[in-house]
A protein has these predicted regions:
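General marker for long, soluble alpha-helical cores
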Residues: 2-279
């Protein structure tokens, strides 16, 4: 007895072709056609499709999730997460450079949610992207470019804690550049130290404005008195509330006041004596 040839299910093919289009795997349509022609049911075909290299490449993030001890996402979850991640990236840096399939797979495999990526990109925008060009140029000359910062924001291996620490360092250093108009007060290690001690962006901007406004004058007073008043001491006083550093400032100012009083009174006394001698 001859076995009847399997009949081709057009309805199943239409449904599966639509599924492939959703997955971005329309190139597998001929494979689906062959499977249905061979007698595979519409329930079996998706299982076989998941074994193809094209499918594994398209949903490569899932294989890495499993290696990382994370559960695989369903195709619908994967595609939804992918679309949301792509939207976040384009919102901040546009399309074409960073919304690549490799980056999307990297974030999905590392379980970076769209909200987490949005938070990280917000940190980048607030602390790097919106800085004036003078700050970007100054930091670039010290080895940190905006592109480096953007890559750190997008790198799931850089923890959010590390990213915030770098952002705080950048903001503190940026405040120094804006206040002085150049990078004379920019020191990467010092900026990180101040950030680690809790100096915020707003505090740094106010503190460095105060320092820049008096730096040359108080430095001149210190040199005239044969004393030291370093930038670090000015920073300690203005940004950290260090009493020892503030006392050093006051000592410089008070020494100058005493010298002024001495010179002024000496001059007045000399003038008085000269005037008395005329009579």
């Amino acid at each position: 007895m001859t076995t009847p040839a399997p009949t081709f299910d057009n309805n199943a093919f239409t449904m599966l072709a639509a599924l492939l289009e959703q997955w971005g795997l329309s190139s597998l349509s001929s494979d689906v056609q062959d499977m249905l022609t061979a007698g595979d049911s519409a329930d079996i075909v998706p299982i076989k499709l998941r074994q193809t290299e094209a499918y594994k490449t398209r949903f490569a993030g899932n294989a890495q999730r499993i290696k990382n001890g994370l559960p695989a996402l369903s195709e619908a979850e994967y595609l939804s997460t992918e679309a949301s991640l792509r939207t976040v990236v384009r919102q901040y840096v546009g399309a074409g450079t960073y919304d690549t399939q490799d980056n999307l797979q990297k974030w999905i495999s590392s379980d970076v949610s769209p909200q987490e990526l949005n938070d990280r990109m917000g940190i980048y925008q607030d602390n790097w992207d919106l800085q004036p060009q003078s700050v970007k140029d100054a930091w670039a000359s010290h080895g940190l470019t905006p592109r480096d910062a953007l890559r750190a924001a997008m790198d799931p291996n850089v923890t959010e804690t590390q990213l915030k620490r770098q952002a705080a360092q950048y903001s503190v250093g940026g405040a120094a550049v804006k206040a002085f108009g150049d990078d004379r007060a920019l020191n990467a290690d010092r900026a990180m130290d101040l950030a680690d001690q809790g100096v915020t962006k707003d505090q740094a901007e106010k503190g460095y404005r105060d320092i820049a406004g008096r730096y040359e004058y108080e430095g001149f007073l210190a040199r005239s008195a044969g004393m030291d008043l370093t930038l670090a001491e000015q920073e300690d006083a203005a940004l950290l509330g260090d009493q020892r550093a503030e006392n050093q400032r006051k000592k410089v100012i008070n020494t100058d006041n005493a010298r002024f009083q001495e010179n002024y009174l000496g001059t007045q006394q000399s003038l008085s004596q000269s005037a008395a001698g005329k009579y």
